[in-house]
Amino acid sequence: DEIDEVFYIIRKIKELISKGVPYKDIAILYRTNAQSRVFEQELLKQNIPFRIVGSFYFYSRKEIKDLLAYLRLILNSDDDISLTRCINTPKRGIGPKTISEIEANANTYNTSMYEAIKDGKALDFKKVIEELKEDLKSCTLTEFIDKVLDKSGMRNALKEEKSLEADIRLENLEEFKSVTKNFEERVGIISLEEFLTEISLVSDIEEYKDDPNRITLMTVHSVKGLEYPYVFLAGLEEGIFPHRNCYSKDELEEERRLMYVAITRAMKKLWITCTKKRMIYGQESPSILSRFVREIDPDLIDGETKEEPKPVKKEKRIYKEDRVFNYGDKVHHETYGDGVVIEVTNTILTVAFNKDIGIKKILKNHKSIRRV
């Protein structure tokens, strides 16, 4: 999958570095901005210096910051900074004057800006937030992100914009669901608070501004005119490269031209990678090798398809089969110990643990939870 792909590329990078190749001689290219997230995440974990050219870090992109502002406000209504960021995103007729009046009322009555909202369009916004707070009680984080994108109007506003910039932003927002899905599968709990705590560790990336020796990450659109001794071209799968939105003959020819540009950026060696399956927008789907790879003369390719040693990954933590739990069942959780089921939905268990841990929402089919 996409994690194996990143591990493979990082392993090859480390081999190059061990032979004396500087980081600055290496580039990782991809078709869509949304693909950068998993590379950022793993390079950061392994303390490998990198920069992104032609875009921002995933968590520094405006639309992702806007979404995080919604999530933080839903979790904590006293967060005035998050409220100020998202109250008029997308535009809903709440201008600077209204926001200043809300802030003044909050200061007068020594309360949060959220509590100071009493009428007008701001009250409509507040009702949306209250509705989303209720939604959070009964769905997974990935399902919840969909509800936030819909009820906030963010998704629809970007669709209506009908521009390449809007399409890219929407792709990034949809990719955020892969972040929540990975979190759920790894830890098994439905906790917006714990999710945001984890995200905060990677969302405030300090750029290696003073270090000229760093790997370059960029889309194939941004690489025109640049060359690197060693290039990794990732995600060569149908629907990614060529892009899923390219239907006409002319659009496919433009994608093919981009592929040529990407391939010819490598001065010494080029790696082309693809996956057998990939998490896209929170859904895992089988991958089909890009037609562009199949069009390359096989004699020019030195392929690697066998399993190679790689960093140990945690096993999949979700059972495919549905497991039956009932109200009152005694259960044991790997981390939280013994507890009692106090609510059951299609996908979520609400479990009361001891007073130090309290009540937790847990994915019903996660391996961390079992009946006792």
Stretch-by-stretch model annotation:
Residues 219, 342-343:
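A residue-level detector for short acidic-glycine micro-motifs
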Residues 303-332:
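Mixed-charge, Lys/Arg-rich low-complexity intrinsically disordered regions
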Residues 1-49, 74-76, 136, 319-322:
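Helicase P-loop NTPase motor core
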Residues 331, 339-341:
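Conserved hydrophobic positions within beta-strands
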Residues 22, 36-48, 61, 68-300:
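Conserved helicase C-terminal RecA-like lobe
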Residues 241, 350-369:
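A short macromolecule-binding patch
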Residues 344-349:
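Short, conserved beta-turn/loop elements at beta-strand boundaries and strand-helix junctions
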